[in-house]
Structures are given as structure tokens and as C-alpha cells.
Amino acid sequence: MTTFTTPTRHTDRVAGLHYAEAPVRQRAVLTCGSWRRVTRRIVCGLTCALTVSSLLMPSVSFAAEWVKVDGSTYTAGATAGDGSTWAWDGADNMTLNGYNGGGIAAGGKLNVSYEGNNTVANDEGNSISVENVTSEGAELNISGTGTLTATAEGDALYSAGDMTISGTGAVNVTGDANGIYADNDLSINTSGTVTANGTHAEGIRAGGDITVTGGGTVDTRSEQDCGIVAEETLTVSNSTLTAQGFGIGIYAFDGLTIDAATVRAYAYPAREDSPTAIYTDEGDITIKNGSLVHAYAEGENAAGISSYNIYPGGSGGRIFISDSTVEAIAHYINRDNGNQPLPPICYSDFVVVEPDATARTFGIFALTEDGLTPATISITRSHVTAEGNTAAILAVVNSADGSISGTIDIVDSIIETPDGGRICDVHFVDNETDDILHQRGQTIGTASDVITDLYSDAIAKRAVIVPVDTPPAKPESKPKVTTAAATIKHVNAKDTLA
């Protein structure tokens, strides 16, 4: 039996220095563990309290009450600046043009517009941050055409409310805590680039929804935690997102939608292992409209793409892939650099050997509890490659009697690998605990009967599913049109990081 860990919701963090919290040990399950969010109810209570208090605040929009630039504080109503590299209009708007100095903070709303090359560094706190004040809630909006570089002992970019990053420029941030952190929603709507690195916490984190749109490129990583975390939903559309982290690459608590986008996610061993490249609980994973997805997880009990749900009234445990190309790989690889196994996110002097076939890993995995919507993996007109030491693709339901089953649906597509591959029923029983646990569902394999052994050779360790040919257009004399199966180059973990 194996326990799994999760990044926890930051329910009582204050503006300023944000550091990773200790993981919470979770309940063990037979095939893949849960990342139960034990603080969710606390968050809901705090949210309700904040909502009530917000109703008592004026609905009129006010200017920022103050700003602090490189150690000096300026109050609203009077303009400020150094005459060349930065200027504040005394309200909500600040411009940067060639700024090279210390941290920038504001009470309330702050719109930062940048051009030219700008550097903001703070070795005692956050680089650019906004906090709530009496007259106005925090809101940070950053837009520009040049380059904005921010480094911080705390969070590089922080908002106690919402945050928006837009424009055509390049935003490059590194925080000793988080790279980018918003207490509420985060919107990245840019045709430029955003690079966010978190040393001790996440590369990007939001307490609400995260949306990535605009056709730009977002690259985020963490050296000790998740690459990107949305405590509500994450939506990536018509853009490119690359996320690399320890434990989890992409974590969307309440659901993930990838729409006509390119997403690459990498997860490496952390804490007690069980890394997952793309993960949701209480929310489904939807990949559609020509999206290209590469998910790679390395470590024992790893999963490339996984959705899980044990909460009554919630969704999750369902993965929908349509008209897209997906590669989900999970392996345990022994890395020997003379000390202990270490992933390449921090080290370059390692040796890669063949995956250890004895470790338990899954390419695409869905799991729900009895009484909830059954686990489902649906693949429609898509090219899917999945690899796992234990199972390439698996959908199961936990129950006390085995009466409910997870399902795999393949529509307008065929199983190309393994030879003779089909959708197989599985029924695993755990008799090692006082409460007998049944797990019923489906996998890709070669058996004609129900598979009862999780480690059966009849379970495909590699599965390739491809779209069927499109029917010829009429009239019949026109050439036959086939669906082109886009491909994603499989990138070895050694080459994923600069």
C-alpha cells in the first residue's frame, strides 16, 4: 500500500514571504493514491466570511492609496517618479521604462505598464506586489512591450486579489518562494512570453482560476514543488504552456481544459514520490480541438495524466480527449550521480538507465469512489500514446462490493498497440485491510476474461490509439482524405531543462 502527498491550499498565508508547506499524508488505495485536500472546507468558510465583509465595502472604484518604490513611500493624489525610469500618476497607473531598482508595492489596484528593459529586485520580500486596503481590494495588472525581469526573496509577483499579465513583451520572474502568486484569479493573456520560476514553492499559483490565452508562451518551473497550481480551474487555449515541478507539473484542483493549445508537463520525484505530470481532483480533464499534450512523470507510483475524485457532489475522475494528440509517459528511472537518485531539474551530471519495470506507474489514470460519477477515460478521433510500468491506461472505481465500474470509451479511433489490443475489464480486490476494497474498471490489454491481477502481463504497458480514416468526400471521384495524426517528439527527461 502506498500513501501520496499533495500541495496544500495556503489558507492562512499572508502577503510577503510565501514558502512551501509540509505535505499532508493521505489515505492509501490499491492502484494509485489520493491527494485529498483536507483544507478545502476551511477555505470555503474563509471565503464565505470574506464575501460577507466585502459586501460592506464601498462599490466605488478608488485609486491606490499608496505606492512604495525602492524603499520610498508615496501617497495617492500626487504624482511621483524619478523623471526617467518610472512614473506614478497618483492613482492606479505606473509606467516603467528602463527601471533598475528595488521592490515595488501598492495598496489597492496597480496597473504597471513597461517598455524597454526593466529589472526589479528585492532581497527582503516581494518584487512587485499589491495588498488590500480599506478603500480598495488588491489588483495587479502588468502589460508591456519590452522586458520585465523580477527577482525576489519572497514572491516575484504577488497580488492579494486578482492578477493579469498581458501585452507583447517578455516577463521573466524568479522568486525564492513563488514566481507568480495571486490570492484570487490569475489571467495570462499575452502574445509574448512569461517565464516564472519558484525556488521553494510553486512557479505559478492562484487561489482561484488560472487562464492562459492570447497565443503566447508560458514556461514555469519549481525546484521544490509544483510547476503550476490552480486552486480552482485551469484553462489553456490557443497558447503554449510548459510546466515542470517536483511532485506535480500541472495541478488544477477543480478541472483542467486544454483547448487548441500546446501543453508540456513534467513531474519528478518529491517528498514521498508519486509524481504526476498533469493532475486534477474534483474536476475533469478535457483536451480538445487539435491540442498537443506531452505529459512525462518520473518516479515510483508516477502517473502521466491523472484525475481523481472522492468528494460527494463534485466532478473529477474523468478524462476526455478529442481531436487531439496526447503522449502520457510515466516511468521509474534509477538515476545514479554518486549520491542518490536525483532528477535533472537541478542537476546535469546524472546517468539515465532503462526504466525499472518493477515500479508501479501509469500513463493515463482515472479513479473515483463509490457513489460518485464513475471514472471515465474517453478518447475520440485522437492520437494517444500512453506508457506505464503497470498500466498504460486505467480507469477504476473504489467500492466496498465492486458493484460500480470505471470505463474506457474509444470513439472513431482504433487500438494500434498492443497487437490484438482491446478494452479489458479489471477487478482488483485488496484483502489486506479490515475493510475489503474492490476496484473495478477497464484497461487496455489483451485478455478476453476479467483481469484480477494488477501486475498481469495482459495489461498493456504501452498503448497507442489512432484515429480511424475519415470517410472519402463525395463525389467518389475526389481523393480520399485521411486524418493526419500529429506527433509530439518524445523528449527524454535529460533534455527537458536548460
Protein language model features and the residues they cover:
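Intrinsically disordered, low-complexity repeat and linker tracts
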Residues: 3-39, 60-62, 432, 437, ...
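Alpha-helical transmembrane segments
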Residues: 38-49
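C-terminal segment of classical bacterial N-terminal signal peptides
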Residues: 46, 52-61
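A composition-driven surface/loop motif
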Residues: 62-472, 488
